[in-house]
């Protein structure tokens, strides 16, 4: 064989070898980034540098999902996956995008996040309500036995033969961000109610108890601000009983957040500690295992009435310890701060302020 042909063959073999090594390296890198839910994360909507972003929280850091996805796709030579920039759309498309979210969490959990433009410290950004806005926010009334008893009820509930009581809160008027104030109208008796929120993941209608959990996306926190009465015009007495709209639909009456935890990371959702404090003093301390109607029974009932949509919020009820049941009754006042902490989800803080005009 002549030398020049030998050199060409050697050169070609070298290029093939380098190409093979490169491809092996790329595929090895792909293979090492698991697309399984190995690393727990929380989801959030947040604002940083004047822009609203969808975030994936890992410990005390939160990643801008869009930017982190772009970098990992390029760095690891992964197939492109378009991830929605709005929470409700992400929930709707979760089956498609969740493997990439798992890859982001699995990769960046061990990465050095300092200096990465898309990684933010939680205390340096503004967390927003995770969904603005769900189609429905539906809330269970008197759904803890201890709360029913403190409110004067002696009834025994049969969850197999009876339906829960629900009311609606207007998402557009009631939902506010974590840390945003609720404005107290002078003379009104405003009470605290800390509650676990269930986030729906798929369209749901006429579900059985067994089908219910499959249609859940995850869990969050809602402060069900409750108006117990006070000064002002009286409600007419044409129909006896409480006026749920008057008591539960105050403007800004549903602080929501800070995170949504996907259900795969909350296997103990039926046994979570829930604590509500006012100015640091514990007022409510209970577990979600004390619910009268559990997740499945609530979803079965609601979907027998209407269709639930991805991103819809079910507010599951509050335990005992509310202000109106205390002796003497206690109500919130301007300057107070309510904090609601639910195990595994986070802490929702809401300051109380005085309403100073017709426009809050």
Regions from the PLM with identified roles:
Residues 12-25:
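Bacterial N-terminal signal peptides
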Residues 31-34, 44, 126-129, 154-156, ...:
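A generic local secondary-structure boundary/capping motif
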Residues 2-15:
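Bacterial N-terminal signal peptides that target proteins for export
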Residues 143, 170-230:
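Non-heme Fe(II) oxygenase catalytic core, chiefly the N-lobe of the double-stranded beta-helix
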Residues 30-38, 147, 184, 228-360:
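Catalytic-pocket segment enriched in acidic/His residues
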Residues 155-176, 192, 333-343:
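Structural signature of FAD isoalloxazine-binding scaffolds in flavoprotein oxidoreductases
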Residues 27-160, 359-360:
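N-terminal non-catalytic cap/leader segment that marks the start of a structured domain
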